Amino acid sequence: MIYEDKFIRVEREENELPWVKIFTAKPYRELSKCDEASRARLYEAMLVAEKAMLEFYKPTKINIASFGNYVPHVHIHVIARFENDAFFPDSVWASTKRKSELRLPKFDE
């Protein structure tokens, strides 16, 4: 766990890519069911994570995703992507295209 407050929690996804998941504190199944304060905090945290990754890692692109098919709890994935990552330009859930050659600064929680 990286961060938690009464509206959200932020977790690091175990992956070679810089990747965080931001969950609502309450187990809402759909974004439209979230209370306004939780939804606002979720988006605020998403933007903070995106800006921090852009500044720290200098990625080619930031991917932002929300599915919830396997984990039916509102959450957003924020993932820094690089031209030389194993999946680029495809989704991180696709098959790998190459061996990754990432050399990234170390991130400590």
Model-derived regions, located:
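HIT superfamily nucleotide-processing domains
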Residues: 1-109
